[in-house]
Structures are given as C-alpha cells and as structure tokens.
Amino acid sequence: MSKVIGIDLGTTNSCVAVLEGGEPKVIANAEGNRTTPSVVAFKNGERQVGEVAKRQSITNPNTIMSIKRHMGTDYKVEIEGKDYTPQEVSAIILQHLKSYAESYLGETVSKAVITVPAYFNDAERQATKDAGKIAGLEVERIINEPTAAALAYGLDKTDEDQTILVYDLGGGTFDVSILELGDGVFEVRSTAGDNRLGGDDFDQVIIDHLVSEFKKENGIDLSKDKMALQRLKDAAEKAKKDLSGVSSTQISLPFITAGEAGPLHLELTLTRAKFEELSSHLVERTMGPVRQALQDAGLSASEIDKVILVGGSTRIPAVQEAIKKETGKEAHKGVNPDEVVALGAAIQGGVITGDVKDVVLLDVTPLSLGIETMGGVFTKLIDRNTTIPTSKSQVFSTAADNQTAVDIHVLQGERPMSADNKTLGRFQLTDIPPAPRGVPQIEVSFDIDKNGIVNVRAKDLGTGKEQNITIKSSSGLSDEEIERMVKEAEENADADAKKKEEIEVRNEADQLVFQTEKTLKDLEGKVDEEQVKKANDAKDALKAAIEKNEFEEIKAKKDELQTIVQELSMKLYEEAAKAQQAQGGANAEGKADDNVVDAEYEEVNDDQNKK
C-alpha cells in the first residue's frame, strides 16, 4: 500500500509527516523549515504558498491568512476578480504540502490523514475533507488534533496505564481533550474547546495596544492603514514570541506612517508583565473548557497523570502557569508543540496501512446531535463525548392532523432551543398517509462515522418509505463544485510545474553562458578561430533569447550551445591528454636523475657516519 502522509492543517502554520521504519518523521519544506506558514498569495496570476507568501504579505493585498477560521462557513474571499472558498484556499496549502512530501519520498502521494480541532463541527470537518479532495488527496481519516498529539506522545508507552490531558492552543483554535492510554488503546474520555480562540487573538491584543499608544502620542489611527496594520501584525507576532524567552522587547517600526510634519516612527518597549495584563482574559478563557472537560470525564485534576501542551501559543509563560495552577501538574516537555499533531497523524496513517499494529483509537463526537421538535425545542439523539463511530434511533410522530410530510431539521450544539444551535442541514420525508396527529411512526436515525461526519435517516415505519442524507451544510460544496475545483487545482498544478520548468531552464541557460565564456578563455589559442567564433555566436544567440524571455527559443538555443560547448570541452581534454603524454615521456627520460638524487642522499648519510 502506498504511503499515507499525516497533515496538521493549521490556522497559522501547517506541518506534514510520514511513517518511516515504524517511526513518524516530519518532512521539511523547500526552505528547510519543518513547518510551513498557512498563507496563500496571488501575484501577477501566480500563486505563492508558505514562507514566500508570508514574506510579501505587507506589500501584497492579495494575501490570504488564517483561512481555517472560516472553514464550514459560506465565507468567500475575492482575489483578482475570482471568488475563493475556504476549501479552495486550504486545498492550495494542502497541494503545497503534498508536493514537497512527494519530493522527499520520491513517489506520488494520494492518501492522507488530516487533523482538525476536536471542537470542529460537522460542517467544518466536511469542508476539510473537501479541501483534501480538491488537492488531489484521498482523505483516509479526519482525526482530532489533541488525539493525534496523544498518539505521538503515547506510541512508545502503550504498556503504561495513564490518564492524560491535552491542552491544544493553536493559531486560531483551542481544544482540550482527556484521554486514557493503556494496552495500545487510546480512548478519548471527553473533549471541549473554543474554535474562535488562538494565537491570533494574543497577537491582536498587542496590535490593539500599539494602535492605542500610537494614537495617544500622534493622534493617528493606524488601524485604518492596511499596510501599517500588516507591519503591526508581524511585529506583534514577533514580540509575542520574544516575550516567551525575555522579560521585555523593543518594538521598532520606522516610517510606519506620515503626519503633517513628515514621517512618523513607532518605538515602544513591551514588557512581559504588560503582555500578561493585556492577554489575561484570553488565558482565563482557556480555563473554562479545561474545567468542562474534567467535569465531562468525571475526573478531578489530581487524577490526571500527564499534561501535554500542543500548539505554538502554549510557549507563552502565562499559559503554562495557568494550566499548572489549574491541574497542579508541570506540563510534559518531551514533545515539540509545533510538530506533535502531524506526527500523530502520520502514526494514524501507519495504523491504516498496517505498519503500526496493536493501536486502537477511540474518539468522541465533540457536540451533541439532534433534531428540532415541536415548539422549536432541540431534542438530542446523540450526546456530546459519545465514542464514535456510533448510531442512535428515536421514533417521532406528526404534530398536526393529516400531515403528509415532515421536515427534519438536523442540529449540533448544547443549547435547549434549536435557534441557538448550529444547523447542519434539513431534509423532508414525504408521502406519509394522512392520519390524526401522533399516529404516524417516524424513526429518525443518526449515524456518525469514524471521521465525525454525520449521516441521518428518516423512515416512516407504516409505509417503509425512507429518506436519508449525508449532512451537507449550507456552506457545503456540491459534488459538481468539488469536481470543478479538483480540475482547476490540477490545471494550476500543471501551470505551476510549467513555471518551475521555465525558471529552471532559464537558470541553466544563464549558467551555460557563464560556463561558455570560461571555457573559451581556457581554450584561447588552443583551438581553431572558426570554432571559437561558432561558440561565441551561439552564446550571443542564447543571451538574446534570455533577454526576450522566449521559453521555447531559450530551450532550443541552450541545447544548440550545449552541443558546441561539449565539442570544445572535448578539445580541452584532448589537449590536456596530449600534455600529459608529453610529460610522461619527459619523466621516463629523467629516471637517471632519480638515481643521482638517491646517491646524493646516500652521500649525506656517509657524512653523518663520519661524524
């Protein structure tokens, strides 16, 4: 079976790993970094992903960041007159990760395990699966990020029984999961979280502080200036990272804007104490889900054996202090918070291919599932933290006499009223025989698969008529849309490959021009003038093609010059061989001289003996 890669598709950074020799290994990108910024940019019709896209984000308004925050919604971003869905943008990132995984493995990759925040609802999970499909990946499994982290942590500890709490604070989402490990079984006991809380919010409090201080001093609101705002964002992210290691940092942004008197600069010292004051409400917000997860698991903090920190934002000292205070445990430092999720996904890939044996993963559904019943009430069929895969059925009836159709409104959430929960989808069961209300028997069945994706079935027990759907939220893509996007993604991949080939050919041509000039210098006076002229003419023709930037012409002229240079190089080697032969003859004649040297050496020894 072909390799199944593990992908941590993050809000701010993404990571890809693979199982090699039974061990998960992170694959570095082309720049040599082990994580890749989840940033996509469009410039002159060309797509840029990762480091290169992030670097030019200040000057390029067509840059998309933190798209994961919009997964499962009908949000669209317009770039150069075209609307992109979160699934399409995520697919561009996935394609990039896939391409450098293929370069590393030396084979085509078509299967992946992709991680999602544990608190992602059905629409968000489905959107992630669709993004994988658009990127040309068969998503073998969607697994929760904290569960993946637990897999990576516990793979070599399967003989120990322990209860672990995974605290996952990423760039845009926050999750807490409590798992029990033992005998190779990873069982999730409970999960809780907040999909609108992450490192981006910690950056934002610094940005707001900088904007406020600058306005106080200069009377100018930087939040209205797009380019200044992007510079502030970069500076805030850097300051946040610095403050994990030092107690104060200098933020210096020269020429941030211009006032009446001329250019203005932003200079400010931010202390760790001030940052902790600004972000204290965010740290406290993470404690709610921690308490909720403990309560749902029926455990006290003292019953937790290990605390695993996941996500770059867990490096913030105030976060570490808060979790230590809440659980009474020092966090386990043996895992890399940026890579552990991708490593866990790669292990799950190994479980699927059969390379990892005796590991069983039992995950849960993060939110309760049910339908709307009379009076707008939300009636739960499957409670949150139920182990998946699972299915549950319940019999309902009609609310009015002679009702021939029922609307099934499927929801996910914890609130008692339907209006306060997330709509997953609606469908109708029709052709119910007219009867007094309360008589028809309609069985509604929910089925959640191992990816946390929901299927719902409604059946009239009287007639046996059945209607079922895989939930497609209002933001979900139709099969036709996905197919179109897959096609576009493939076309873009071909265009990217062609562009890459053009750059490589151009670089080779430049190198060949330089090489030719060097070779001609070395051959000066050693070959016919006519051959030198022929090479010079071919070199000038290639230079002209490079200047015109005509790909096919560059290719043809490059091949032409290459042939001439090879002939010249052969001449050079022939000359060298002749010179060597001549040298060899001289050496043979000089053997008598060698004897003289020996005699001279003996003579010295004789002198020494006389002494």
From Swiss-Prot:
Its main location: cytoplasm. GO terms for biological process: chaperone cofactor-dependent protein refolding; protein refolding. One of its GO terms (cellular component) is cytoplasm. It comes from the Bacteria. NCBIfam families: PRK00290.1 (NF001413), prok_dnaK (TIGR02350). PANTHER family: HEAT SHOCK PROTEIN 70KDA. This is Chaperone protein DnaK. It comes from Bacillus subtilis (strain 168).
